[in-house]
Design a protein with these regions (language model features):
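A charged, amphipathic alpha-helical module
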Residues: 2-70, 186-289
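Redox- and metal-dependent alpha/beta enzyme cores, enriched for Fe-S-associated oxidoreductases
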Residues: 66, 78, 83-97, 104-105, ...
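Short, acidic/turn-prone active-site loops that include or flank metal/cofactor-
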Residues: 95-101, 164-169
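Structural signal for conserved beta-strand scaffold positions within catalytic alpha/beta enzyme cores
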Residues: 74, 93, 162-164
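Glycine-rich, highly charged phosphate/nucleotide-binding loops
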Residues: 112-127
């Protein structure tokens, strides 16, 4: 595994505090994921991504910036990655999935604010996550009052752009959201220095749709009994989808699905046939939560 400490230092990170977070993740990951029985071989790639989560992909983002490109940090799922990619940028999802970052958020947010928001702000202010140090622009959305306030605070420390998400689904709300996307396009073009063309947008739409199709294929394999991949591993892959290179991610997910579909044909699975299932809805659950 490469040594990324100099990169972290160059990003202005608190390396000593970051090491405290890095010290607990390997044991947690082994207990929750690696010790599962009969895991698919195709999970090796995704395990490697997490094993070097603050190294390989951040280094790619840094290299992209050194080559003159721009990186956009996005929260939630409402920011259209297609526009960012069409403008020559890279979109990377930012999560608030660790309690480790909550105290940092509590220095500027009320204690009764939800942990997701506090962790998202804390990850930036604590300087312990490279994904929160790299972006040229952070793009938030108005899904709740807590986030609205959080973006005001984040804007004091980093460039922030907020998309105004309508609260209803009326025609006027759809039109308002369409206008928000057009305004975002203008902002992305301004930051990136590149115009979005019909051709570049066509390519980026196909790229992101291929990623979505790969995820849909993965989820469809879990309809079978016995299930060929655990829910925990499926959640892990869905999180990696937010920040991995979209073309590489789609290729590796499809390769995994080839293996899973072969297991289905053989009647093999990671759990007994008709094993009980738990339905989880809402926001994606991020490692280590």
């Amino acid at each position: 595994m490469a040594d990324y400490r100099q990169m972290w230092i160059d990003l202005g990170m608190d390396v000593e505090k970051h090491d405290m977070l890095g010290a607990v993740l390997p044991d947690m990951f082994q207990q929750v994921y690696l010790l599962q029985d009969q895991r698919p071989q195709g999970m090796n790639y995704f395990d490697a991504v997490v094993a070097d989560i603050h190294g390989i992909r951040p280094a790619e983002l840094v290299q992209h910036r050194q080559n003159g490109g721009k990186v956009f940090g996005t929260f939630c799922v409402y920011v259209p990655d297609e526009i960012i990619i069409a403008a020559g940028g890279i979109a990377t999802g930012l999560c608030g999935g660790s309690q480790f970052w909550v105290p940092g958020g509590e220095t500027v947010l009320p204690l009764n604010t939800c942990s997701l928001i506090k962790a998202s702000i804390g990850a930036r202010l604590d300087k312990t996550c490279p994904f929160f140090r790299i972006p040229d622009l952070y793009i938030g959305e108005t899904t709740c009052d807590g986030k609205k306030k959080a973006w005001e605070i984040l804007a004091q420390d980093a460039p922030v752009y907020v998309m105004d998400l309508p609260q209803m689904k009326r025609r006027q709300d759809v039109e308002a959201w369409e206008n928000e996307i057009k305004l975002l396009l203008q902002k992305v073009e301004e930051v990136s220095g590149h115009k979005v063309t019909p051709e570049s947008l066509d390519r980026s739409i196909k790229l992101i749709n291929n990623k979505r199709k790969a995820l849909a294929r993965l989820y469809n394999t879990r309809k079978n009994s016995p299930v060929p991949i655990s829910g925990k591993d499926a959640l892990l892959i869905s999180q990696i989808a937010f920040y991995d290179d979209p073309e590489r991610f789609a290729n590796m997910t499809n390769a995994l699905c080839d293996e899973l579909e072969a297991s289905v044909q053989k009647g093999e699975g990671v759990l007994p046939k008709n094993a009980p299932r738990i339905l989880i809805t809402g926001t994606p659950m991020a490692v280590p939560n």
